[in-house]
Amino acid sequence: MKTIVLIRHSEPIKDRTLPTALLPLSERGIIMAQELFSLDIFRSVNAVYSSPYQRAFSTAEKLCVCFSTDYRLRERELGNPQTLDADFWEHQYENHDYKNSDGESLNDTRERMTLAVGEILSSMRDGETTAVVTHAAAICAFLLNECSIEVVNASEKIRRIMHHGNTVLNGKIAAPSAFILNFENDRLCSINYLSTEKN
């Protein structure tokens, strides 16, 4: 079996003056990443890949393992903020080709994420665990290959993610949190959600 742990980056600072790619982790985000990475699954990580966005690679650094960045692991490009529809978040799950002006659809994002994760999976040996630090929409886009995703509450960004009839998540994707993907013969056989967030 091979295991890929898809990790949503930890909590960034809130600063609308910075480009989204340059947002660093907040002090709380640093602590939260350390808490997540203290869990057993992360003791057996053999390799780490990260989005090049600062909040992602700053999260990856907390694993204390050398890592590579891959531009394909970046967050979904929202496009022109002036033309962003108020209902965009919900519409994207109704139509996976839906996109804002100059932005990416979930299908666009799924295509590049699938290529990146597929290459990572092919490079792994049985028994290995690889961590991939990326972003919530990018993770969801990839999971659409095997999962159904339903918007439960658009204003709160609450999703129901189902895999072969099993509920993987019914809530928000915490920052940080992880989806543990287990593969047999390079085919996805199970997904589990992992978070240290207190409800």
Located regions from the model:
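Acidic, low-complexity terminal tails and accessory targeting/binding regions
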Residues: 2, 75-87, 94-95, 126, ...
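Active-site-proximal alpha-helix that buttresses catalytic centers in soluble enzyme cores
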Residues: 2-68, 104-107
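Beta-strand elements within well-structured catalytic alpha/beta cores of enzymes
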Residues: 3-8, 49, 127-138
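Conserved histidine-centered catalytic loops in small-molecule metabolism enzymes
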Residues: 41-71, 173-199
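Active-site signature of alpha/beta-hydrolase-fold catalytic machinery across serine-
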Residues: 62, 141, 145
